[in-house]
């Protein structure tokens, strides 16, 4: 248990909550949303513990060498100390001898917050969440949107070399906790905006490319 910060269940008292283990403290290098959003779910891994760092270094090397992947997608970055990835990514590249381009999901509409993270972790790119929300707003505005200002306040506008643009993903589709689905009528235009733009690295969602016939939520674009 000493490799974790805390959990959301006290078995002794059968109480739900966010419980910080004795002798631990939440990481300071996370988003200040809700005060401190280090804890997200399950058992929160203590990524500043030297034993945990050594194991994640070992696991990262094993995973890259076993699977042969040539890039990484990092999830829920705002809940993990930025200082961990600032060290882990360069070390993994050094140990494996691979470039391993990385893109992270830092879910925030505030481009300044994304820029701050990239300053702390220059070894990764980030998904352009502000742009996604601009596209979502445009698709639900009944045509009342100034498209000439669509890229204002976006990561691709501020730091195009490290911005990964996207229209939709698994979190934004209907039924998800972060659902902010781009309306079907606007999706072809949204993809034209990201795919035909010189700046940024575009990413196409599987569900938009092939549809999601299992649920019928999203038609193929």
Region spans (language model):
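Active-site-proximal helices and loops of the catalytic beta/alpha 8
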Residues: 1-10, 58-221
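Core domains of carbohydrate- and sulfate-ester-processing enzymes
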Residues: 1-38
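Short, functional N-terminal and low-complexity linear motifs
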Residues: 22-29, 53-57, 155-161
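Active-site-proximal loop/turn and secondary-structure-junction residues that shape catalytic pockets
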Residues: 27-32, 41, 78, 108
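General secondary-structure edge motif
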Residues: 36, 43-44, 150, 174
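Short, solvent-exposed coil/turn segments
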Residues: 38-40, 159-160
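Active-site mouth loops of central-metabolism enzymes
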Residues: 42-55
């Amino acid at each position: 248990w000493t490799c974790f910060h805390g959990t959301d269940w006290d078995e002794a008292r059968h109480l739900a909550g966010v419980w910080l283990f004795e002798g631990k403290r939440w990481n300071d290098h996370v988003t200040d949303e809700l005060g401190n959003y280090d804890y997200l779910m399950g058992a929160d891994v203590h990524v500043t513990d030297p034993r945990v760092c050594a194991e994640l270094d070992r696991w990262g090397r094993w995973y890259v060498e076993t699977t042969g992947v040539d890039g990484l997608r990092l999830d829920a970055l705002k809940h993990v100390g930025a200082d961990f990835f600032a060290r882990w990514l360069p070390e993994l590249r050094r140990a494996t001898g691979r470039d391993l381009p990385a893109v992270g999901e830092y879910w925030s509409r505030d481009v300044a917050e994304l820029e701050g993270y990239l300053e702390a972790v220059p070894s990764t790119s980030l998904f352009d969440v502000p742009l996604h929300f601009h596209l979502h707003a445009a698709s639900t505005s009944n045509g009342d949107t100034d498209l000439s200002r669509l890229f204002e306040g976006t990561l691709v506008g501020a730091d195009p070399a490290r911005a990964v643009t996207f229209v939709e993903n698994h979190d934004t589709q209907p039924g998800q906790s972060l659902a902010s689905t781009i309306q079907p009528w606007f999706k072809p235009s949204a993809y034209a905006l990201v795919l035909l733009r010189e700046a940024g690295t575009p990413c196409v969602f599987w569900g938009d490319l092939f549809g999601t016939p299992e649920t019928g939520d999203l038609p193929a674009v």
